[in-house]
Curated annotation (Swiss-Prot):
Protein name: Cytochrome c
Maturation and modification: Binds 1 heme c group covalently per subunit.
Function: Electron carrier protein. The oxidized form of the cytochrome c heme group can accept an electron from the heme group of the cytochrome c1 subunit of cytochrome reductase. Cytochrome c then transfers this electron to the cytochrome oxidase complex, the final protein carrier in the mitochondrial electron-transport chain.
Gene3D superfamilies per record: Cytochrome c-like domain
Localization in the cell: Mitochondrion intermembrane space
Pfam families in UniProt: Cytochrom_C
The entry's keywords: Electron transport, Heme, Iron, Metal-binding, Mitochondrion, Respiratory chain, Transport
Molecular-function GO term, any one: electron transfer activity
GO cellular component terms, A-Z: mitochondrial intermembrane space
Major localization listed first in the record, in broad terms: mitochondrion
Amino-acid positions noted as binding heme c in the UniProt annotation, renumbered to this chain: 19, 22-23, 85
Family: Belongs to the cytochrome c family.
């Protein structure tokens, strides 16, 4: 299927509105309700040091990348049944693509 090209500036707005209450992205950022996302791109699920993940997240065993994030962000609880993440998801493909573009830039 492939992930459409996203706009990182739009993605930042989505992150601030929908994600920042539970996640940080900067190096050395604190865990909140959800883990700090710095360095998560290319890492397996449930691996942020010092964060207490659900068994479902630890056991999923996928690597975060464009395709996995695109599917996960549509419906997190469907993609990882048992996840602690309470976010309902982003149904619009362009919003998911924008958020992914922002996360790729901001979590390096």
């Amino acid at each position: 299927m492939g992930v459409p090209a996203g706009n990182a500036e739009n993605g930042k707005k989505i992150f601030v509105q929908r994600c920042a209450q539970c996640h940080t992205v900067e190096a050395g950022g604190k865990h909140k309700v959800g883990p700090n996302l710095h360095g998560f791109y290319g890492r397996k699920t449930g691996q942020a040091p010092g964060f207490s993940y659900s068994n479902a997240n630890k056991a999923k065993g996928i690597t975060w990348g464009d395709d996995t994030l695109f599917e996960y962000l549509e419906n997190p609880k469907k993609y990882i049944p048992g996840t602690k993440m309470v976010f309902a998801g982003l149904k619009k493909a362009n919003e998911r693509a924008d958020l992914i573009a922002y996360l790729k830039e901001s979590t390096k």
